[in-house]
Amino acid sequence: MANDLFLRACRREPVERPPVWMMRQAGRYLPEYRAVRQRSDFLTMVRTPELAVEVTLQPVDLLAVDAAIIFSDILVVPQAMGMRLSVDDGVGPRFHQPLRAPADFSRLRDVTPEEQLRYVLDALRLARQELNDRVPLIGFAGAPWTLMSYMIEGTGSKSFSQAKRMLVESPASAHELLGRLARTVGEFLIAQVEAGAQAVQLFDSWAGALGPRDFREFALPYLGQAARLARSAGAPVIVFAPGSGWALEEIATVTGADVIGVDWQTDSAEARRRLPASRVALQGNLDPCWLYATPALIRERTREMLEAFGGRSHIANLGHGILPDVPVAHARAFVDSVREWQGP
């Protein structure tokens, strides 16, 4: 492979510099992405391997990031289970018949990745061909708690009151669904590795909606089940649970992940102190809003972040997804500042 920095960092092997990529790097901040989006709706892009691969490769070609992540969406799993999904501009994703009672769970069907999710696997296969070993390819999926939250709420939420109400009123049913999702997600990630993904990331996007007790009961065990099942495929596993920085050590222990994502609300040096480079690799964690700053200031803040992580067992990234109105030149300043860094 021409550039294996990312995979070496995942395995905590020596690297010349930290690798860099960005969550949501194939996204609306790129004019080239918007050009594809103008001729196709979001879900068609996700479900059409040729379009998904076209935008997957854009940040590799335009910004020289050290890894590609397949263009897809975490909600393809509930959709594969039979839920009707739409994604509307200005509104975001929405399930048309959310699961508001345990009886609704019977509507869900079992998933065989090579059947209902074949389009994702075909996109991974095609992306590996098109990348031609220039950089590694990352696959991903949503974590059980986050998926269940969307499936019950029907859309994103500030309070997640409906999902949390299910935990309170019907905990046994919630556990049953979370266990089912953990198996489905884990099997999906294994299938992604078999289709060509060289690492996979689990996104528990709404982990921060739960307090410590509920996180430990309803999110962490199933995040761990999915991660450990995925690890059986042999590729590095990354876990990112924003809003749960207080639990970094527990997440590392329960999931056995090779890489733990660090959000922008967690102090970089503190994360490294709590999870030393000898134990696990860390990924993150520049606040995406710093990409609104001048390129000079972006470089300064990025260097501070790199120094805080210490240069070992670290994958440079943002502490959340890149925002859609960030200037491309500012994203490039972030990537270039990592590529040019000479070490602490």
Feature locations, PLM:
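Short, flexible active-site-proximal loops enriched in glycine and acidic residues
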Residues: 67, 96-97, 136-138
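Short, flexible, mixed-charge acidic loops at enzyme active sites
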Residues: 83-98, 150-163
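Short glycine/proline- and acidic residue-enriched helix-loop micro-motifs
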Residues: 41, 102-112, 167-174
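A gly/proline- and charged-residue-enriched helix-loop-helix capping module
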Residues: 90-130
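N-terminal basic, low-complexity leaders that serve as flexible interaction/assembly modules and, when applicable
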Residues: 1-89, 126, 299, 307-310, ...
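A short acidic, glycine/proline-enriched capping/turn motif at secondary-structure boundaries
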Residues: 74-77, 92-93, 102-103, 144-146
